[in-house]
Amino acid sequence: MAVYTDVAPAELEAFLSGYDIGTLTSFHGIAEGVENSNFLVQTTRGSYILTLYEKRVNRDDLPFFIGLMEHLAARGLSCPQPVAQRSGAVLSEIAGRPAAMVTFLPGVSVRRPTAEHCAELGRGLAQLHLAGADFAMRRANNLSVAGWRPLFVAADGQADDVAPGLADAIAAELATLEANWPQGLPAGVIHADLFPDNAFFLDEKLSGIIDFYFACTDFLAYDVAVCLNAWCFEPDGSYNVTKGRALLSGYEAVRPLSGAEKAALPRLARGAALRFLLTRLVDWLNVPEGALVRPKDPLEYLKKLRFHQAVDSAQDYGLAA
């Protein structure tokens, strides 16, 4: 989450008048994340999250995101539920941006996940995949393999300004993955951005999953690979196989991976690392002036990519033989 667009108190009060959720008592921007502008809104009825969809978000995708949250919540997954206005509309506009109000989930995100957190996360991810199996809408993953070269181009020759040799490293990996990306794996709704700041815990148990604005239709095992990258590396860049084993065991307790998915996991993990390396690189080079946002270090994902390049099989991630 982040804040790119400011909202004036009077604007927000007028916006809230279209909802049956009480009157405004306080609000503040949320700095975490990179994509949209988010505010924690307190009213006389409770707490809510207001999201303003920024220019990088395609308005045509918003019904997918909103519909998915409604679908998953209806199937028992703990995730934000869109709040309808009195008119029945879920999408509205404020400060010149499309906007939606969603329910606030209790719990806290963890900055240093334990193996127990990883096991909980694995189970929750598999439950999300099963709950989304009958979701009728589809959305292509525009940040999968076909979208990586345009991101590299968007870095506009500046990769080596971030680290010498980075451009060549990205170019080589991109060529390898474009030529060898897995095909025909089980697919469905994926979260695609399930980092620790998008999962909430209460008493060490997963209490909710948030921020579905990268969700799309893609290989389910790619979502697992994203989570291995996001949850199972230590601050020094080393892979924690105990956390990986916990995450994978938790996932497979709910939805066992197929043989093809297991075989593809190292390549999928490389792809996930390259995806976040590229998007972080572009964001690092293009932070809007005055935005309340913390750009994330792209080189963290270069280190992770180097690890994945040396992996022989899914067993190296902790997957049971």
UniProtKB/Swiss-Prot annotation:
Keywords: Amino-acid biosynthesis, ATP-binding, Kinase, Nucleotide-binding, Threonine biosynthesis, Transferase. Pathway: Amino-acid biosynthesis; L-threonine biosynthesis; L-threonine from L-aspartate: step 4/5. SUPFAM superfamilies: Protein kinase-like (PK-like). Coiled coil: none annotated. Its EC number is 2.7.1.39. InterPro entries: Aminoglycoside_PTrfase (IPR002575), Homoserine_kinase_II (IPR005280), Kinase-like_dom_sf (IPR011009), Pseudomonas-type_ThrB (IPR050249). This is Homoserine kinase. It comes from Xanthobacter autotrophicus (strain ATCC BAA-1158 / Py2).
